[in-house]
Amino acid sequence: DTCCSIEDRREVQALWRSIWSAEDTGRRTLIGRLLFEELFEIDGATKGLFKRVNVDDTHSPEEFAHVLRVVNGLDTLIGVLGDSDTLNSLIDHLAEQHKARAGFKTVYFKEFGKALNHVLPEVASCFNPEAWNHCFDGLVDVISHRIDG
């Protein structure tokens, strides 16, 4: 959290609002699918974590719901970057969820961050990787520490 300055938070939140607050669920789903496709390109082993949500069929209702759950979770985290109590509560919840997933490794959060760095510049005109990485990497460090103990 200390590396994610107030300016970084504002920039990340403004960028995210510009791509995510649209009422178009189709766009949200497309962005989410692009993120997961990129993640699977970065590390094919991650795909095995999502078999229960029918990830091989990118148009299945299970995969659709999962993509929205994950990216809506990210949306919630971004929305509360300036609210430490709520953010910490959400991070605790996410840490417990991911701890319970067989085969999950905290390095996958970093790989998801790489996917974000590839996809977000394609869907947002004002992507600032420095601000984004300050905030996202800070979240990853905290949640990873809580998972790994």
UniProtKB/Swiss-Prot annotation:
Stated family: Belongs to the globin family.
Residues annotated as domain Globin: 3-148
Amino-acid positions noted as binding heme b in the UniProt annotation, renumbered to this chain: H98
Entry's Gene Ontology molecular function annotations: heme binding; iron ion binding; oxygen binding; oxygen carrier activity
Organism listed in the record: Tylorrhynchus heterochetus (Japanese palolo worm)
Localization: Secreted
Primary location group: secreted
Disulfide pattern: C4-C126
Protein name: Extracellular globin-2C
One Gene Ontology CC term in the entry: extracellular region
Pfam families: Globin
Transport in keyword set: yes
Subunit record text: Giant hemoglobins of worms are formed of a monomeric subunit and a disulfide-bonded trimer. IIC is part of the disulfide bonded trimer composed of IIA, IIB and IIC.
